Design a protein with these regions (language model features):
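Compact soluble domain cores
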Residues: 2-66
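Short, compact, well-ordered microdomains
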Residues: 59-96
Length: 96
């Protein structure tokens, strides 16, 4: 599990990756783990200030968490943790 005591801000639940995100990561020659670690530590990536503030609120109120990252080849990816913390999913924006 990637939840690291003292670093992870929340329980990620089960990790899931969509076929599109898995293919995009493979095409970019990258792995999801660094992005998942960033998400779990509160580094929300390429989110605007308003969405980062929404995540801060969501942490305190057990709401959905969103991160957005750009892979080395320019592909946009999202990571979403469900409000009930049952699952964290790596996906492409068009798979939402």
């Amino acid at each position: 599990m990637l939840a690291i005591p003292g670093i992870s801000l929340f329980d990620p639940g089960q990790f899931v990756i969509t076929p599109g995100a898995e293919a995009a990561l493979a095409e970019a020659g990258e792995d999801a783990h660094p992005y998942l670690r960033r998400h779990l530590s509160g580094d929300w990536g390429d989110l605007c200030v308003e969405d980062q503030q929404e995540n801060a609120y969501s942490l305190d109120h057990n709401l959905r968490l969103l991160s957005a990252y750009t892979l080395g080849n320019g592909t946009k990816t999202w990571i979403i943790t469900e409000a009930d913390r049952s699952a964290t999913t790596v996906l492409l924006p068009d798979e939402y």
